[in-house]
A protein has these predicted regions:
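Membrane interfacial helix motifs at helix-loop boundaries and amphipathic/re-entrant anchors
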Residues: 28-60, 100-127
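Hydrophobic alpha-helical segments and their boundary regions
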Residues: 5-10, 16, 21, 49, ...
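Hydrophobic alpha-helical transmembrane segments
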Residues: 15-19, 57, 86-90, 121-125
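Cytoplasmic membrane-interface segments at the C-terminal ends of transmembrane helices
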Residues: 2-14, 65-89, 108-112, 131-159
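Core segments of alpha-helical transmembrane spans in multipass integral membrane proteins
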Residues: 53-72, 93
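Hydrophobic cores of alpha-helical transmembrane segments in multi-pass integral membrane proteins
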Residues: 23-30, 58-65, 132
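Transmembrane alpha-helical insertion/packing segments
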Residues: 1-43
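Transmembrane alpha-helical segments of multi-pass membrane proteins
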Residues: 18-22, 84-101
């Protein structure tokens, strides 16, 4: 990476990237839970008295907290830190695990659907990857001279 900031980044760009990261993270949760559910032959919430929307609520709360952490990561990067903040990466990973388990315990889920659930454990690397991908894209935008990626038909070489 270059020594100083090469390009200014608007608040709109950061918010757009943050929103895209949250959407990708939610899609990764759906995909990983679907594959895990097919492989294990079970659902994330199997307790009959607990409604399934509590799982959606738990993931929604965790995504909201991820958004706050990503905003803090962006502020750190814009202030000149050129490496991901390890506390934010670890906070996101353990935070999603804690949120899922606390929502599950408040809803009355047993330990095998909260603390020891593979569905809860797989959330941790997904949240860590989301923070790192957000950092990579934003750092590339701020600290490099590289243009935005383009599809082959968008390339400028053939037009001139």
């Amino acid at each position: 990476m270059a020594e100083g900031a090469k390009r200014g980044v608007t608040r709109g760009y950061v918010l757009g990237l943050l929103g895209a990261t949250l959407v990708v993270t939610a899609a990764l949760v759906v995909a990983s839970w679907g594959l895990l559910g097919m492989a294990l032959g079970r659902e994330p919430i199997e307790t009959p008295d607990v409604p399934l929307w509590l799982g959606v609520l738990g993931i929604g709360i965790a995504l909201g907290l991820l958004g706050v952490l990503l905003w803090r990561q962006a502020l750190s990067l814009l202030r000149g830190s050129k490496s991901p903040v390890a506390g934010i990466v670890l906070g996101a990973a353990f935070g999603v695990y804690l949120v899922w388990n606390l929502v599950g315990l408040l809803a009355g889920l047993p330990n095998d659907e909260t603390w020891f659930s593979p569905f809860a454990i797989i959330l941790m690397p997904l949240w860590a990857v989301a923070v790192l991908l957000f950092w990579l894209v934003l750092a590339r935008r701020i600290y490099t001279d590289r243009p935005t990626p383009q599809w082959p038909w968008e390339r400028r070489e053939g037009r001139e």
